Amino acid sequence: YRLTYYTPDYQVAETDILAAFRMTPQPGVPAEECGAAVAAESSTGTWTTVWTDGLTQLDKYKGRCYDLEPVPGENNQYIAYVAYPIDLFEEGSVTNLLTSIVGNVFGFKALRALRLEDLRIPPAYVKTFWGPPHGIQVERDKLNKYGRPLLGCTIKPKLGLSAKNYGRAVYECLRGGLDFTKDDENVNSQSFMRWRDRFLFCAEAIYKAQSETGEIKGHYLNATAGTCEEMYKRANYAAQIGVPIVMHDYLTGGFTANTSLAMFCRDNGLLLHIHRAMHAVIDRQRNHGIHFRVLAKTLRMSGGDHLHSGTVVGKLEGEREVTLGFVDLMRDPYVEKDRSRGIYFTQDWVGLGGTIPVASGGIHVWHMPALTEIFGDDACLQFGGGTLGHPWGNAPGAAANRVASEACVQARNEGRDLSREGGDVIREACKWSPEL
């Protein structure tokens, strides 16, 4: 492999798709051989020379390992940079992109472990994707909500409630001051609560809360299903009853289904909330798998208006700088290379819409100052137990979150330092909000 696929003199083309792999070779296997093997196995190579190689232009189509750097502080671990010609990939297909780059190479014998740390998607390839159904600005315009983070809540217990009781919990949270409530990722259509009943009772809750508060409300109706046809049926029903947003579990549902649903949502005026169930199976190991920043990039291409992104402060794992790095990759039009935040390549999204990061998991009102400072306005903060665990009930829990959020936004706008004064801001707000 090394003679053909390790090319340290290669000049990267503007249209190349670039990958950074964290590579741990087996003892005794040279890093150059491993890097070349990764490039070969994820592009045109196979385990032996085949006569049909002579019938194609291998130099035009092969992946190339063009750089290797040792990982500081790690024994026998390297970052291998691989460049792939754009012609290897089908236009507008995240499925094909991932099948090519990570489909086969991770079981390779010469490697002890392999992790895809980052991808550079060139503008020429980005332009073949539709991206999020609507994007951040259109969502704000649809909801008529500006200048603050959006607030949500996952209805708990996530399994076991009847549709009517579920709808009642939705209504109380929305009436109390939240913008959204949410189906949990494993709420689909079980015997205790079929999807159509849930959709109807949640729609009733949304309309009742809207008429009482004068604000636009939503509930993420989970359209994830066992087949794409059933998923379309559920999303179509949501559009017919006039709700603003549906939801999809994009890793368990698959990228093909997700891209199809994103196109449906764009055509039918629905926002699309994306849950990342199963991500930790893929991204939690430090030296093997796929980093979440890659899953976030591919989701932005496939299509989603919201994506769960970790909290930095709650019960689920997430390092601050690294989390902020992939939050920027989800939202911003252009992101500079910054290794301190785990960003290996400069990424230009050339007009592809942004995805709102969703902070969810073990957060409550005392986290509000930190969340406001870390995520800024273009984020959705979701308090499940932090709303429903309020001693007075769901609506007071929702009111407490809304008051805390608005107090933090006001303090920030007045120039106060939330990292130092956050606790004081919340305590001051308590004086005029008994719920808080």
From Swiss-Prot:
Q: Which cofactor does it need?
A: Mg(2+)
Question: Is Oxidoreductase among the key words of this record?
Answer: yes
**Sites of N6-carboxylysine modification:** K182
Q: Which UniProt keywords apply?
A: Calvin cycle, Carbon dioxide fixation, Chloroplast, Disulfide bond, Lyase, Magnesium, Metal-binding, Monooxygenase, Oxidoreductase, Photorespiration, Photosynthesis, Plastid
Chief location bin: plastid
Site, as annotated: Transition state stabilizer: K315
EC numbers on record: 4.1.1.39
Q: Which residues does UniProt mark as catalytic? A: K156, H275
Q: Which residues bind substrate?
A: N104, T154, K158, R276, H308, S360
Enumerate the residues binding Mg(2+). K182, D184, E185
The UniProt PTM text for this protein says: The disulfide bond which can form in the large chain dimeric partners within the hexadecamer appears to be associated with oxidative stress and protein turnover.
On cofactor binding, the record's note says: Binds 1 Mg(2+) ion per subunit.
Record's miscellaneous remark: The basic functional RuBisCO is composed of a large chain homodimer in a 'head-to-tail' conformation. In form I RuBisCO this homodimer is arranged in a barrel-like tetramer with the small subunits forming a tetrameric 'cap' on each end of the 'barrel'.
Quaternary structure and interacting proteins, as annotated: Heterohexadecamer of 8 large chains and 8 small chains; disulfide-linked. The disulfide link is formed within the large subunit homodimers.
UniProt protein name: Ribulose bisphosphate carboxylase large chain
Question: Which species expresses this protein natively?
Answer: Euglena anabaena (Euglenaria anabaena)
Q: Which gene underlies this protein?
A: rbcL
